[in-house]
């Protein structure tokens, strides 16, 4: 079959190929015009990526996660927890890159994190939110339409695959191992329950794909002293009890990058970990792109409705 295929190609290309010069040039011009308009349509909507921010290595991992997207759209990152200063800088940067509108993708574990503050800053909410906030919310100077993503990494089934890979890569004898997935966790009890429920849903993939003794999820409630102390005691007791039963606990952090404070929390206890968060992993990039595309569609729909209302 392969030799017949090669023969047919040889016969075809051994014949003279005669194309009138006018047709050839017209084809080239059409191709260039088409590719130019495609690039233009790709780059009209900028991607403003919000991320927590941390060490140079932490920030570098986020930068790397969007490196492959920069060829398709203007990209700017606003580090900080809904910090109006970095949001304004990133917005201005996108406009300087030629963005005519902006899709804001929030690279947070929970979709609830800083959602109200961000919506207020981008003039999508009329009133400033009250309560826990690292930065005083303020309205940004907007000169282009903006749309905001609502979901977080906890809502993405793609993250389940990352958790499965982390567990399998760390496993030696799964029947004698228990998985413990630990997240940052919020202060509000009801919101924390939502975190745990979503983490447990993603952890189901490990239960299905692995043969571990148990798969467990919990949060540390890191920024709330009283609640953190109770969580630490519970987590440490679990690791200690599993060791006493002859099982090894594999700790997987459900955080964007790194191991956070867990080395300190579990100091002196026997466990296994590689300290990898969700990054680096191409599936986070896939999630960012999908959030960008859905937020971009919201922008296009909104602009279409605005045009129709003015007709």
Stretches with model-predicted labels:
Residues 39-311:
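Active-site-proximal alpha-helix that buttresses catalytic centers in soluble enzyme cores
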Residues 10, 31, 38-40:
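Intrinsically disordered, low-complexity, compositionally biased regions/tails
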